[in-house]
Amino acid sequence: MIQMQTTLDVADNTGARAVMCIKVLGGSKRRYAGIGDIIKVSVKDAAPRGRVKKGEIYNAVVVRTAKGVRRKDGSLIRFGGNAAVLLNAKLEPIGTRIFGPVTRELRTEKFMKIVSLAPEVL
């Protein structure tokens, strides 16, 4: 569960290391975001020669949460931390590589590019 002020790791090669959620998109009173939801983030820590700079604002999709996701069969998939992939204005991934596993819940038309780049889909 991601809410405002939550810090997330970045699971791509854009150069950002840590981002902070500044808004959960999708409704005026929406408080929490889960896996597959789009959030607005601010870059808090970035590599010196990366594509993104500290302080820049981007859209991001949540790919891993410590809270996890419940499947229809009752199983629960949790992760050790929260992670996101940065997106451009057209909601396409900025990076060309994805690090770490992603869940099957991302297999929608919007995020097939992320699923195809990921090394493992759970």
From Swiss-Prot:
Biological process, per Gene Ontology: translation
Record-level Gene Ontology MF annotations: large ribosomal subunit rRNA binding; structural constituent of ribosome
InterPro entries (alphabetical): Ribosomal_uL14, Ribosomal_uL14_bac-type, Ribosomal_uL14_CS, Ribosomal_uL14_sf
GO cellular component: cytosolic large ribosomal subunit
Transmembrane segments: none
PROSITE patterns per UniProt: RIBOSOMAL_L14 (PS00049)
Superkingdom classification of source: Bacteria
Keyword field: Ribonucleoprotein, Ribosomal protein, RNA-binding, rRNA-binding
Role of this protein: Binds to 23S rRNA. Forms part of two intersubunit bridges in the 70S ribosome.
Subunit structure: Part of the 50S ribosomal subunit. Forms a cluster with proteins L3 and L19. In the 70S ribosome, L14 and L19 interact and together make contacts with the 16S rRNA in bridges B5 and B8.
Family according to the record: Belongs to the universal ribosomal protein uL14 family.
Protein name: Large ribosomal subunit protein uL14
Species this protein is from: Bordetella avium (strain 197N)
